[in-house]
Amino acid sequence: GTRVRISRELLMQLISTVPPEFTLHARNPERTVQVGGKNQIFVPMYGAPYVRDLDNNRRYGSLEDLNNFHKLAYMLPALHSSSSICCEPMEVAVPKRHLHIIDSALTHSDKPFMGIVTSKERAEDVMKMAGIVFGDGFVKDNTVVVSITNCNSPLVWDQTMLDAMRVYASHNQPIIAAP
């Protein structure tokens, strides 16, 4: 690929447009949180392919596990978000898995949730689901989902992550870009 370089001036100009903090809205307004500034938010882990059950067995996650994790996140006052992919529900086919994951986050918790970044289409589905829950007009003007993207290696971003980032950015939703 081609290495893209951004000038320091442009980078600093773009960074200056980022608000020092923003409101991440929850389905339940009482669970809405402020992100940034001196605020700390705690969320469940994200993206685990395995779970460890009460018998100490390591196994693939299931939809039941995911639902239970979202219910736990909802009940724990120390957590400010239900995340989304607390574990992968491996019995659900990949093309539809994201729908079940977001449905679980929105059904079993009224806290803020995180988006899916595994394809442009899946990110678009997340935004459609957010529009159903919050109303398209509200989503247009407010932050309702935050997503985390990561590079494959230093200096390499794949098309999947970039496409998902574009979807969320086009809806004015924040993205955590992890190195």
Would you name each region that the model predicts?
Residues 2-53:
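Glycine-rich, N-terminal phosphate-binding loop and its surrounding beta-alpha-beta segment
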